[in-house]
Amino acid sequence: MRSRLISWAWGLLTPVLLAFLWEFFSRRSIAHAYAFVPVADIWRSFWELAGNGDLALNLWATLRSALLGLSIGTLLGISVGASMGIIKTADVLIGPIYHMVRQVPLLGWIPLIGLWFGTGVFSKNLIVAMAVFYPMALHTYEGIRNVEKPYLEVGEIFRFGRWQRFVHVLLPNAWPYIFTGFSNALAFAWVATVGSELLFATGPGLGALMLIAQSASRMDVVIVCIVTIGIIGCLMNFGIGKIRKWFLGWHCAH
């Protein structure tokens, strides 16, 4: 218990030092105070946004977009990755296109997506789904293709059909890869959601709130949004780590 408290204390040392350094720069001049907003102003803005409901409204909108894009991208990614891993024809037909398309940076698709679908909610969700799709498809494919030979031989002994072989042999052994892909996809989904809100500033969202605050020279609000995005991202990463540890531990035990 004592060692854990010491570890927590050391972990808080860097943020505290950064806060003191930030406050030091904010007091150097008026120009510095604009770029490095005093901590007291940031704290005051946080309570202002929390009190009037703006922070909760925009945070929920961003979370909703991230979860929707994450769900769609995960389902499509697992489906396509599994198809390429199981069906040789699908690998031949889809594989080259997939590996070529995933080399294009996501930002490279923004002009076309905006031209084809406009700058509304659909475009934002599409960007998030694409960000999730790539790692999910790749890790599912790698997980299925790297199943060890003895497990495949067990399926042959029991004369499993293609579906039984997938459910009872390939998918269970691919779960570690899939969870690794999901961990990456979750981070990509969160970043892509905020990025799409900054690019397509339509509707509520933390990214849209940051743009409005920037145009109004409210850098304190911008900092509140940035800190909120970072905290939620860390909580997501912590949560998926716990779920991964529990699920894979339970799966291995069974």
Spans of model-derived segments:
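N-terminal signal-anchor/first transmembrane alpha helix
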Residues: 1-26
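Transmembrane-helix boundary motif in ABC transporter permease subunits
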Residues: 68-98
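C-terminal transmembrane helix and the adjacent membrane-cytosol boundary/short C-terminal tail
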Residues: 88, 145, 176, 180-183, ...
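Glycine-rich helix-loop "coupling/hinge" segments at transmembrane-helix boundaries
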Residues: 115-116, 192-228, 254
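Transmembrane alpha-helices
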Residues: 126, 130, 162-194, 229
